Amino acid sequence: MSSTSSSQMVQLVADKHVRYILMAEKKKESFESVVMDHLRMNGAYWGLTTLDLLDKLGCVSEEEVISWLMTCQHESGGFAGNTGHDPHILYTLSAVQILALFDKINILDIGKVSSYVAKLQNEDGSFSGDMWGEIDTRFSYIAICCLSILKCLDKINVEKAVKYIVSCKNLDGGFGCTPGAESHAGQIFCCVGALAITGSLHHVDKDSLGWWLCERQLKAGGLNGRPEKLADVCYSWWVLSSLIMIDRVHWIDKAKLVKFILDCQDLDNGGISDRPEDAVDIFHTYFGVAGLSLLEYPGVKVIDPAYALPVDVVNRIIFTK
């Protein structure tokens, strides 16, 4: 399905990945589509951002995407994973990111959306994901990233938010989902990303964290999320983006990681899997292409490691009043 037996590195089959993403949206009755129905907003963000990184966002109907996206907004201001589902901070960020891709943030009632996010901050500075109250540093990142894109960071207590994130730092330099929780690459991205956006990276022990992150690279070149786990393409994003934000990306073997990602492609039908020869999906296709972007692979647009959006999109947001 994916890798070749020769030592020669395969190339990125970008056109096939574009076709795979466009076809995936049309296969409403497929197993993948059915099981992902409740998080379609995330799937849309993964697919659309991949298309943008490959300079093919124009292949989709902007009007159709935005029309569907707005049906997912709840009266609270938050967005759900699909029409008729409950709102959650995770899907709200994905919705805002999608609108950013299309330069359509102005269609939002920004005050309403930002208030929904801000109300999820707890007294200790942490954030809940929704009204049910689960707390996780993922939600801290999501809130900070979302409000930064909307230019509404002043709606939360940033100092308390940063203090809570720092309280989740471990002796190995990494970060967990809550204070005392095990360090994990996904949580590290969230914490480092939030600290980067708020200008608080001085709280990170860059050498200790950099060492922990570069130890995630295995012999085949791929990265895992924590010790003793298998390599997975998605960590090409979580680990690499964090290393870039703390200026330690030169500590890993980039060429071997590029080969690992490329070997996870389905060269016939498009899409990228978690590891060579496994089934492809939208999630890993996005993180594989995003990882190649961070690795400066030819033909892939540059992605911002903190905002997880193409740099041209982020620049447009930052420099627009």
Curated annotation (Swiss-Prot):
Cofactor(s) listed: Zn(2+); Mg(2+)
Pfam families, A to Z: Prenyltrans
Annotated control of activity: The enzymatic reaction requires the aid of the Rab escort protein REP.
Cofactor note: Binds 1 zinc ion per subunit.
Per-repeat ranges for PFTB: 14-55, 62-103, 110-151, 158-199, 206-247, 254-296
Gene disruption phenotype: Pleiotropic effects on plant growth and development, including dwarf size, aberrant root development, multiple inflorescence stems and small siliques mostly sterile. Impaired shoot gravitropism and photomorphogenesis. The double mutant plants rgtb1 and rgtb2 are male sterile, due to shrunken pollen with abnormal exine structure, and strong disorganization of the endoplasmic reticulum membranes.
Any one GO biological process: pollen tube guidance
Sites bearing N-acetylserine, chain numbering: 2
Single annotated GO MF: Rab geranylgeranyltransferase activity
Keyword field: Acetylation, Magnesium, Metal-binding, Prenyltransferase, Repeat, Transferase, Zinc
Binding site for Zn(2+): 232, 234, 284
EC number(s) on file: 2.5.1.60
Subunit structure: Heterotrimer composed of the alpha subunit RGTA, the beta subunit RGTB and REP; within this trimer, RGTA and RGTB form the catalytic component, while REP mediates peptide substrate binding.
Function: Catalyzes the transfer of a geranylgeranyl moiety from geranylgeranyl diphosphate to both cysteines of Rab proteins with the C-terminal sequence -CCXX, CXXX, -XCCX and -XCXC, such as RABA1A, RABA2A, RABF2A and RABG2. Involved in the geranylgeranylation of RABA2A. In vitro, can prenylate PGGTI targets with the C-terminal sequence Cys-aliphatic-aliphatic-X (CaaX) with leucine in the terminal position. Substrates with the C-terminal sequence -CSIL such as ARAC11/ROP1 or GG2/AGG2 are prenylated independently of REP and when the beta subunit is associated with the alpha subunit RGTA1. Required for male fertility and root tip growth.
Entry's family note: Belongs to the protein prenyltransferase subunit beta family.
Name of the featured protein: Geranylgeranyl transferase type-2 subunit beta 1
Organism per entry: Arabidopsis thaliana
Gene assigned in the entry: RGTB1
